[in-house]
Amino acid sequence: MGETRRHSVDVPITRTLVALRRVRSLRDPCTTSMSKFASLLDNVKWETGSNNGISLQFVEHADDACKAAADAPVGLIPFGSYSIMEELESGCDLHKLSSKVINVEGDACSRSSERSCSDLSVKGRDLACNAPSISHVEEAGSGGRYRTHYSTKLASSVGEYGSRLGSPMNSTNHSYYGDEDVDFDSQSNRGCGITYCWSRTPRYRGSNQSSDVEEYPLLPGNGNGESDVVTPSHEVLSRSLSQKFRPKSFDELVGQEVVVKCLLSTILRGRITSVYLFHGPRGTGKTSTSKIFAAALNCLSQAAHSRPCGLCSECKSYFSGRGRDVMETDSGKLNRPSYLRSLIKSASLPPVSSRFKVFIIDECQLLCQETWGTLLNSLDNFSQHSVFILVTSELEKLPRNVLSRSQKYHFSKVCDADISTKLAKICIEEGIDFDQGAVDFIASKSDGSLRDAEIMLDQLSLLGKRITTSLAYKLIGVVSDDELLDLLDLAMSSDTSNTVIRARELMRSKIDPMQLISQLANVIMDIIAGNSQESSSATRLRFLTRHTSEEEMQKLRNALKILSDAEKHLRASKNQTTWLTVALLQLSNTDSSSFATDENGRNQINKDVELSSTSSGCPGDVIKSDAEKGQERNCNETVESVWKTVTDLCCSDSLKRFLWKRGRLTSLTVDKGVAIAELEFYTPQHVARAEKSWKLIADSFQSVLGCNVEIQMNLVISACSPPKSAKAAASLFFGLFSCSRRMLHKSYLTTRTDSDCASEKPAVTNSLRSCQGNVLRARSVRSSANASSRMSCSSDQGDATSAMCTPHIPPGEKRPEDDTDVLCWKKTPLGKGQSETQNSKSSRLIGRVLPCSTAAN
């Protein structure tokens, strides 16, 4: 009965003492509340009964405390049971001290306590830099049992040790729980110093490890380059190869020698600007260079060429993620006004402990216009120690003001040889077996991006024990060169069925049509350029043996053109497989004879002189010598051969027969890469039919001549049989007018008269020229004063060919200006008993020609 009454009195006293300690500590955090009770706590023992809570007993000797600890079934571990003084006197090695473990079972009736002083693997853990244990986090979530692990940081004196042992409110150790919500943004706010209270509410207190190294800026180490201060490793978890082998110094950058040299010179000479702009393709090292440059700006090493050294306090704090003067951000955050204001305020203040305050903005092309305006307006108000490093892969999207106020550095694509060397080093360091051909293939497919190459290498290392070329083909989804050469050989050998089967197999299992046609084009270009690999396969050598002649090379060039045209159709088509199959079948349609005819025709055209003959209204005005007549005969033979070649190349047999029987090539002029071909037809129906097929005719001319072609179609009408009425002539004129506007190429539509006999008068005819949908004015020439209008004629056989002419303007009247409309007149042949005056009165207006400033005068 007395024992029960004694415990009932002790419990309120114990609670009162605990409350008093907490109130004093909260009221005055700088004061150690237990220091007032140091004399009482020198010999103290905490004990809890099985059912009666905590009782405080004072003992006079530490031995009694140890003896009482053995009798106490449950409670705190007594102070006297540890030989702390012996360990402190021997050197206070934290790694040799064991931590105290309290295991609280869920059973309220039976509790047991255990302590361990030496078995660290089961009952405790070492104190190393206050780093949280991953195993503890995993054990925190176990059900049915609540187990907590405390780590104790020893003090430097016995009195302080006793006070901290008695009151956990002033302890500076760090506890981590699996359900603990850590706010990393408030690490600088240390609070009152309370790590956790007795209500078991966990609180995070950031470690102030920088205070351990502030007194040693260069950290001389132990003589072997190692630092005395132990820092946590930031490569604990396994990462991808691109992250693991990210450059940490300028020497590790690949393929950017010019940029590295310029940045090192900037640091050496101290010519630091406010804004740097790193631009270039993705995966070329822009972001890594910005981080290295930021660390080099604040590095404390005396040797500028070795910055960042990685040994000084600034380098260690930055690379461990604790640098306060280097901030990395992205465009998404900066587009928020609150975050932007915070950044501007921070940039206006001097750095905390470093030399420069560096702001790295990645993907800066995503910043909005308002953000750019605010940054540029505030740039002059920033501290002179603030440096901005902008990183972008799309330079054209940045405002011009940013480009003019920044120092730009272009990061070019990394060459395949450098990428291959880097990948080989990674494989050797990681112990990965590889084929050199596979590494070279990865480098060629990375398109100058080292990061993409490292990612592909990382994926291949997960697929098998050895990286091979076939494995790389399967991963990337491309076809090997041997398979491409087999398909190309089948397509060019007119093996239709096998070509279709092979193409469908490739597209069904490995590759899409767009990528297949691109690979075929690349293989053909390599063969034409003469690029041969050192270790060429048997398939490649066999293909090169068959296709080495000039005729086969011409076939390959034609195949490249067909594939280029097919790629345009594939981009706009939903059925890409069909279009690609059609393109492959077209590779064997053209035989060698057509190519030989093509080349011969072009060589003859290049040797020809300009074919244009002059004529006048009367025969005999121009007397030709025998040499000129012989040259003209040769030219006529050349024109006839060209015309025959053009008609033979027409796809339609009916069009081929029509052009050969009903049409004639009368003149062909090649000037400055443009050929002008004049065709003659004898009826309006023939002209209309030729106009409907003008595209096919133009394609045939371009295939033979190899240059742009302007087609002029002339209608030859005999003066003895003029149109029966003016209405028929007008309909003929407007019919030709409508056809000319539909033509894509520049065309000449001319109505001609045949003047074989000298007694016939030439009839005035109509000429139209279309240029981008406009009808142009032709030259007007007056050959005599008796005629009201006269034509400038151009014919190789003395025929009178008329151009668009203007009516005769009597003296005293104003001549129309160049930009005014020109009238087109119809003049009929003179009959018996009619004079020029009578005929001019019978002329009537049948059309109006639009002016064009580009027309030739």
Swiss-Prot record:
SUPFAM superfamilies listed in its UniProt record: P-loop containing nucleoside triphosphate hydrolases, post-AAA+ oligomerization domain-like
Gene3D superfamilies in alphabetical order: 1.10.8.60, 1.20.272.10, P-loop containing nucleotide triphosphate hydrolases
Extent of Basic and acidic residues compositional bias: 599-610
GO molecular function terms listed in the Swiss-Prot or TrEMBL record: ATP binding; DNA binding; DNA-directed DNA polymerase activity; metal ion binding
Signal peptide annotation: none
Region ranges (Disordered): 593-629, 787-845
Keywords: ATP-binding, Coiled coil, Metal-binding, Nucleotide-binding, Zinc
Protein's GO biological process: DNA replication
Cellular-component GO terms for this entry: DNA polymerase III complex
InterPro entries: DNA_pol3_clamp-load_cplx_C, DNA_pol_III_sug/sutau_N, DNA_Rep/Repair_Clamp_Loader, DnaA_N-like_STI, HLD_clamp_pol_III_gamma_tau, P-loop_NTPase
Binding-site list for Zn(2+): C299, C309, C312, C315
Polar residues: compositionally biased ranges: 834-843
Coiled coil: 544-576
Family statement: Belongs to the DnaX/STICHEL family.
Protein name: Protein STICHEL-like 2
Organism: Arabidopsis thaliana (Mouse-ear cress)
